[in-house]
Every structure is written in C-alpha cells, then in structure tokens.
Amino acid sequence: MAIYDFIVKSENEKTSKALEKYQKFWTDDEDKYDGMTLKEFKKDGDPGDKVYQYPPLDVDVKLEAFLGEDGSTEIRAYIENGTEEIYVGTAAKTKAKKILKLLQEIDPRITGELYGGKYWKMENSGYVDDRWKEDLTVRVYLEW
C-alpha cells in the first residue's frame, strides 16, 4: 500500500451509498490498517461499516488543521461538492505538514490552511462546535 492511500470508514448509510462508486479494496490480509489486519478489522468493525480505497481526488478539497487541547492537530478536509465533509483524524502537530504534503502528492489542487493557538484551544469555554454533526462524518485514516 502506498503511503498516501486512504481508508474510509463511513458510519452513515447515506454517506456509505455516496462512497460506493469508489473501488473497494483490501488485497492482503497481512496489511495492517489502524493496527489491525483486514480479518481483524472485519471481525471488530460494525457490520454496516464499509471500507473503501479513496482514488486520486477528482474534486476540490480544502484542508484545515486545528490544535487540540491535548497538543494533537486535528486534520479536517472538506470535499467542495456541497454534500460531503470528511473528518481525517488526528495527528501530532509535527505531522500536520507531512499529511498536507502527502495529500498534495495525490492531488495538487488540495490547499492547506494550518491553524493553531489559543483560538482553537477552547479550554473550559463551553464552546460547542456544531459544524461537525455525526450524520455528516466520514472517518478517514491516513497511513504514514
């Protein structure tokens, strides 16, 4: 598996259907994804979850990274077709630029906006980010 392949796991039926046009993959049970082999993943995962390879992107994507309270950087990617939002996951702050570089190798149209600092470190503020509703979430795990 190339370092910039994606694993997409959708927990939402509508999003799963939207992703079905992409080619499903898993060729080698010895390959590990999220620390598990394919067999382990299928056994452990929700029966409704589906795993897909994300092809080279053919839509515009905006990438953002936010500094989390634990010092990690949350990477968010938006597919600019008005219907999909992708949550890419968390990564150490030092890896955020590396992830952006890998995404840009897939599709140079991906733009990066790296944010951090006090604004996004909402400690004890009661701030609720309602832009990320569960029914819009697609979880994407990057191998690096």
What is each stretch, according to the model?
Residues 1-144:
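Conserved active-site motif detector
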